[in-house]
Amino acid sequence: MYIPAHFAADDATVHELLTRHGAADLITLTADGLLATMLPFAYEPDAGEHGARWGALYGHVARNNDQWRKPALGESLAIVRGPDAYVSPSWYAAKAEHGRVVPTWNYVTAHVYGQLVVHDDPAWVEDVVRRLTAKHEAARLQSPGQSPQWSVDNAPRNFIEGQLRAIVGLELRITRIEAKAKLSQNRPVTDIPGVVAGLSARGDDRSAQAVEHANERREAQDRPGGRRGRNPARSAN
């Protein structure tokens, strides 16, 4: 992935994206070509027993899905997407100053590469199902007016066992991550309030907060003694 230095996501951003996000596009190259599946996943940063710095992603697919049956050639790839949004040039202060502005698209994404391991084991799969359920039920309860938390144990055991037989577990042992947070860091600081206000007015608070936080970090880094000096010539891609 092309990542200009000012859009490179730091470790904390990557960890937050993998921890909070719910699903990824899992892509594998097989002898028959490329295969892809939307994969709900749980991130385990401490799964380093195989020497992986970043840990592993755990998930499952339908037993009828051919992707788990066809061996991956080389690394597999999971594409995790964070907030993304259209950015109108009408939001920039620079529009009124000189008019030399164009639209763009802000986004946060991580390309997670690793060794794909298949777990055709009901006990392993049940553990992952319980992790995923606990994660997303807890997140759901953060919103008001929710029904009580659901647990795997709320369903009849024989029903759960039948459901588990219909899925297969997948583990992506992470070998490397390429991550990008393109959040208007290439714009003059005077343009940032307009971007945040524009996104907020459209109801996209998540993108607005991402822009705000990324540019707060940028300002801290650009101050004397920060991690980098100011570089006025920054790519927009």
PLM segments and residue spans:
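Short, structured beta-strand-loop surface elements
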Residues: A62-V128
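Pocket-edge structural micro-motifs
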Residues: T28, V61, V80-G82, I174-R176, ...
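Short connector loops at helix/strand junctions that flank enzyme active sites
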Residues: H21, A36-M38, A52-A56, P71-E75, ...
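Short, glycine- and charge-enriched coil/turn segments that flank and shape catalytic ligand pockets
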Residues: P45-A52, P71-A72, G203-D205
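A generic local secondary-structure boundary/capping motif
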Residues: H15, R100-V102, F159-G162
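Short, basic/aromatic recognition patches
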Residues: M1-D25
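C-terminal edge-of-domain segments
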Residues: V117-N237
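Short beta-strand segments
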Residues: H21-R63, A78, P89
